[in-house]
């Protein structure tokens, strides 16, 4: 901000504080009391928008509304303003001979951004705009800072994220995004509740970081004098509940991963995980596509959505494709025949796939997928059959134990869900954890830790189980056509602002 703008802003702050002082001198509370509203702006339009000017004059409908002043004009003994609430804006008309000298002075000295209450009659102007003619004008909150320019709003994207409250004031689109987010989560809950799932709550601080391959945040519990991890997944506690006999469970909650920030990643994000006893990953595929289609229909009214340049069809059934077939289809590389690590590395070299020297065949297969296939998956596609090396908690496939009964859901080249037939063999699970420990020793700090307590739980017997995790933030991005995860998080993680 240059010196002139800085000085102008300071002048505006001073003027508003002078007005604050004057209000108090007059015995008026600038941060007022409860105001009872009869209607929102949307109510007025839906209830009275179709009435003619003459019908409204005849009916003399009195309403009470409240909101923030967004525009204001007029001189002398009358003026107009637009006030805004959550749903939208409505015009108000204030006349000195109707509200009286004191209240009219409140109106004339009010600034953009002030919160006011209006009691008045609904009418239409000569050009047909639905409005409220004030018979009472109440100042509810004095705004001490000017709003961003109403014609330009918040053009600085970073400022929108840092000062979300200003973004919500100035952008109806942003408000609608977060209302839609709430509806998406509500419909997700409703779908699962109606299908017999039980919502539960499990700890966010874990003694062992498990359930995913990710770097955790650490903290220290002073009273217990022990290191704890902010959870990187909800999985292992929910599967303990399956062992305990809660046959269909889910949790919607925050997960924390100490990793990079991007348009698709935030260190703190929201997931839903669910588990169903006596089911497998095929059942979970059906549940996933039906649930997402249900949410789209209920919230958006359609299963055909626009995301960027793509028209996406969410109507089931979605494409199902084995990871090895997807790689062969998009790169020509064939991993169906068993091969040594050396052969897999040579294949990677031939196809210009970057790999690390510590990678086993399964890791190399996954790199082929990520580098050659992932960005081609636009329409909803279940990729299944992940290598066992990268799926320590998934059950091996009966026909080819190199692979697992696991799937990931891809839409517009992004992973939206991860699911599998859960590994319920405690001996196999311990061996998988031991293999993960070796990876940690070789420098993979995202490899899974040993969890003896979870192994012990499995030893009591967990029924065959299907499990699912969906990143809610990415789902909201998809359904609101948002290009960045920061657009669907009210307060995304940001670097410290430089002075």
UniProtKB/Swiss-Prot annotation:
Mg(2+) 2 binds at residue 415. The keyword Ligase applies. Its main location: cytoplasm. This is Lysine--tRNA ligase. Belongs to the class-II aminoacyl-tRNA synthetase family. Its EC number is 6.1.1.6. Its cofactor is Mg(2+). InterPro entries: Aa-tRNA-synt_II (IPR004364), aa-tRNA-synth_II (IPR006195), aa-tRNA-synth_II/BPL/LPL (IPR045864), Lys-tRNA-ligase_II (IPR002313), Lys-tRNA-ligase_II_bac/euk (IPR034762), Lys-tRNA-ligase_II_N (IPR044136), Lys-tRNA-synth_II_C (IPR018149), NA-bd_OB-fold (IPR012340). CDD domains: LysRS_core, LysRS_N. It catalyses: tRNA(Lys) + L-lysine + ATP = L-lysyl-tRNA(Lys) + AMP + diphosphate. Transmembrane segments: none annotated. One of its GO terms (molecular function) is catalytic activity, acting on a protein. GO terms for cellular component: cytosol. It is an enzyme of class 6 (ligase). Homodimer. It holds the Pfam family tRNA_anti-codon. Gene3D superfamilies: Bira Bifunctional Protein, Domain 2, Nucleic acid-binding proteins. HAMAP family: Lys_tRNA_synth_class2. One of its GO terms (biological process) is lysyl-tRNA aminoacylation. SUPFAM superfamilies: Class II aaRS and biotin synthetases, Nucleic acid-binding proteins. Binds 3 Mg(2+) ions per subunit. It is found in: Cytoplasm. Mg(2+) 1 binds at residues 408, 415. Keywords: Aminoacyl-tRNA synthetase, ATP-binding, Cytoplasm, Ligase, Magnesium, Metal-binding, Nucleotide-binding, Protein biosynthesis.
């Amino acid at each position: 901000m240059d010196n002139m703008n800085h000085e102008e802003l300071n002048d505006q702050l001073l003027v508003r504080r002078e007005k604050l002082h004057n209000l108090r001198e007059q015995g008026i509370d600038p941060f007022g009391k409860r105001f009872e509203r009869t209607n929102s702006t949307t109510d007025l339009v839906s209830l009275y928008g179709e009435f003619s000017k003459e019908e409204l004059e005849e009916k003399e409908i009195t309403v009470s509304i409240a909101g923030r002043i967004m525009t204001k004009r007029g001189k002398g003994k009358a003026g107009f303003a637009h006030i805004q609430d959550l749903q939208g804006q409505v015009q108000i008309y204030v006349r000195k001979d109707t509200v009286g000298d004191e209240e009219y002075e409140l109106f004339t000295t009010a600034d953009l951004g002030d919160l006011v209450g209006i009691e008045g009659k609904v009418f239409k102007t000569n050009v047909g705009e639905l409005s409220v003619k004030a018979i009472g004008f109440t100042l509810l909150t004095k705004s001490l800072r000017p709003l961003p320019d109403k014609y330009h709003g918040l053009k600085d994207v970073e400022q929108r994220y840092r000062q979300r409250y200003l973004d919500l004031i100035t952008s109806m689109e942003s408000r609608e995004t977060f209302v839609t987010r709430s509806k998406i989560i509500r419909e997700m809950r409703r779908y699962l509740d109606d299908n017999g799932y039980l919502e539960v709550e499990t700890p966010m601080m874990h003694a062992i970081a498990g359930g995913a391959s990710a770097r955790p945040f650490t903290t220290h519990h002073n009273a217990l004098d022990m290191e704890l991890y902010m959870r990187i997944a909800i999985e292992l506690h929910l599967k303990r509940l399956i062992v305990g006999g809660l046959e269909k469970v889910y949790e919607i909650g925050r997960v924390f991963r100490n990793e990079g920030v991007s348009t698709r990643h935030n260190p703190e994000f929201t997931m839903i995980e669910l588990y169903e006893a006596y089911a497998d990953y095929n059942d979970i595929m059906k549940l996933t596509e039906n649930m997402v289609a249900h949410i789209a229909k209920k919230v958006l009214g359609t299963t055909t959505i626009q995301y960027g340049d793509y028209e996406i069809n969410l109507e089931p059934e979605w494409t199902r494709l084995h990871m090895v077939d997807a790689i062969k289809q998009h790169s020509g590389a064939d991993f169906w025949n068993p091969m040594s690590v050396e052969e897999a590395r040579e294949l990677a070299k031939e196809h210009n796939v970057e790999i690390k020297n510590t990678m086993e065949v399964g890791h190399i297969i996954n790199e082929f997928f990520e580098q050659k296939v992932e960005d081609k998956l636009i329409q909803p596609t279940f990729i299944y059959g992940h290598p066992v090396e990268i799926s320590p908690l998934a059950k091996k496939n009966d026909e080819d134990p190199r692979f697992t009964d696991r799937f990931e859901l891809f839409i517009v080249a992004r992973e939206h869900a991860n699911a599998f037939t859960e590994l319920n063999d405690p001996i196999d699970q311990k061996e998988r954890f031991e293999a993960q420990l070796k990876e940690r020793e070789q420098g993979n700090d995202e490899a899974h830790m040993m969890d003896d307590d979870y192994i012990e739980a499995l030893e009591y017997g967990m029924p065959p189980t299907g499990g699912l995790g969906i990143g809610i933030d990415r789902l909201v991005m998809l359904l609101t056509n948002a290009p960045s995860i920061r657009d669907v998080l009210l307060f995304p993680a940001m670097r410290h602002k430089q002075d």
